[in-house]
């Protein structure tokens, strides 16, 4: 069930303050964050966030198509190494 429109998108306050400070200063430094739950808003455009994936911070450059999605969607938490290939040599008929 989507969030109510009257509430607006959720963004952690500390993250919004960092983005606003960089927008006022005109800089685009990398912002480290653990807030995967924050929604990407239009004022995030052009910024790079280092989103924590549970192990390391993954750099995420925000583009226009990302607006409305959550930061955590762009930093996968699981690495898929592929299924194990069948060993035909050890198989009996």
From Swiss-Prot:
Biological processes, Gene Ontology terms: ribosomal small subunit assembly; translation
GO CC, any one term: cytoplasm
Keywords recorded for this protein, A-Z: Ribonucleoprotein, Ribosomal protein, RNA-binding, rRNA-binding
Residue numbers spanned by region Disordered: 1-24, 73-93
MF terms (GO), sorted A to Z: rRNA binding; structural constituent of ribosome
Cited PROSITE patterns: RIBOSOMAL_S19
Listed InterPro entries: Ribosomal_uS19 (IPR002222), Ribosomal_uS19_bac-type (IPR005732), Ribosomal_uS19_CS (IPR020934), Ribosomal_uS19_SF (IPR023575)
Bias-annotated ranges (Basic and acidic residues): 9-21, 81-93
PANTHER family: RIBOSOMAL PROTEIN S19P FAMILY MEMBER (PTHR11880), SMALL RIBOSOMAL SUBUNIT PROTEIN US19M (PTHR11880:SF8)
Function: Protein S19 forms a complex with S13 that binds strongly to the 16S ribosomal RNA.
Family the UniProt entry places it in: Belongs to the universal ribosomal protein uS19 family.
The protein's name: Small ribosomal subunit protein uS19
């Amino acid at each position: 069930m989507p969030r109510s429109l009257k509430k607006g998108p959720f963004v952690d306050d500390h993250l919004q303050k960092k983005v606003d400070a960089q927008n006022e200063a005109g800089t685009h430094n990398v912002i480290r964050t653990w807030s995967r739950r924050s929604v990407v808003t239009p004022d995030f455009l052009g910024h790079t966030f280092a989103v924590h994936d549970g192990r390391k911070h993954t750099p995420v450059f925000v583009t226009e198509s990302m607006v409305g999605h959550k930061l955590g969607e762009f930093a996968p938490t699981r690495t898929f190494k592929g299924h194990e290939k069948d060993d035909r040599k050890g198989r009996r008929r």
